[in-house]
Amino acid sequence: MPVVSLAELLESGVHFGHQTRRWNPKMSPYIYTARNGVHIIDLVQTAQLMENAYEYVRKSSEQGKRFLFIGTKRQAAGIIAQEASRCGANYVNQRWLGGMLTNWETIKGRVERLKELESMEENGAISRRPKKEAAVLRRELGKLDKYLGGIKTMRKLPDVVVIVDQRREYNAISECQKLGIPIISMLDTNCDPDFADIPIPANDDAIRSIKLILGKLADAIYEGRHGQLDSEQDYEDFDESISDEYDDYEDEEEYEEQDLEVDASEDE
């Protein structure tokens, strides 16, 4: 039985690329045709490459390798959190902080601070502080959880990274390349396949397309860790309304990295 059928790919809109004027010529081998000024991805290749990606991920998971899902745009953020959590992977679905991988020791210190504040909140220690001090601590807790909550259980650098929207996540990709971390990437028609170790040609803008691809990769991780997937297990479908909480993300005031005491200059 194939990992994903052509019918599933079509139904999820995986074949829709970008306008032809916005393409990257390096994606030409993965493009089937152009219709009404929009490139159409070759789903036969997508299906085959999904088979390859699934098997790679399953075997890596079976070997105990660690995975990190990265996708910070609104359409992907909720799905990233849901699928990574389902299969036991870590994730980043808010703004990528410079040095998150290349300056991991510093980031790890902030993760420990997050855990400390969570413990203080749970045991009532924050509530016992003066009102103003408690508010400051809760604000710090909120910021740390927003940006680092998805990597709270990540004790070491990931062995494999899964990327949604290569062009948006170029900083994360650059750090992975510096560290030699393999990259599995959804590649829309405006992407560069040279920056993906394991390419999956697919629409990286549509929620249903992102859900299908990430869901299959999460299945592979789960299968590698726990054995064959239970066909009767009813995984909750992604609620598209979840993405509403990310609607204002682009309009947010830029988050100051110094609030997390991250010094990206240590990367150099």
UniProtKB/Swiss-Prot annotation:
What are the alphabetically sorted keywords of the record? Answer: Ribonucleoprotein, Ribosomal protein
Biological processes annotated in GO: translation
Any GO CC annotation of this UniProt entry: cytosolic small ribosomal subunit
Q: Which domain of life is it from?
A: Bacteria
Pfam families under this entry?
Ribosomal_S2 (PF00318)
> What is an example of a GO molecular function annotated in this UniProt entry?
structural constituent of ribosome
Q: Which Gene3D superfamilies match?
A: Glucose-6-phosphate isomerase like protein, domain 1, Helix hairpin bin
Keyword flag Ribonucleoprotein:
yes
List the biased-composition ranges (Acidic residues).
Answer: 231-268
List the residue ranges of the region (Disordered). Answer: 228-268
**CDD domains assigned:** RPS2 (cd01425)
InterPro entries in the cross-refs = Ribosomal_uS2 (IPR001865), Ribosomal_uS2_bac/mit/plastid (IPR005706), Ribosomal_uS2_CS (IPR018130), Ribosomal_uS2_flav_dom_sf (IPR023591)
Q: Does the keyword Ribonucleoprotein apply?
A: yes
UniProt-listed NCBIfam families: rpsB_bact
Family, similarity comment = Belongs to the universal ribosomal protein uS2 family.
Spell out the HAMAP family in the cross-references.
Ribosomal_uS2_B
Mind telling me what this protein is named?
Small ribosomal subunit protein uS2
What gene is behind this protein? rpsB
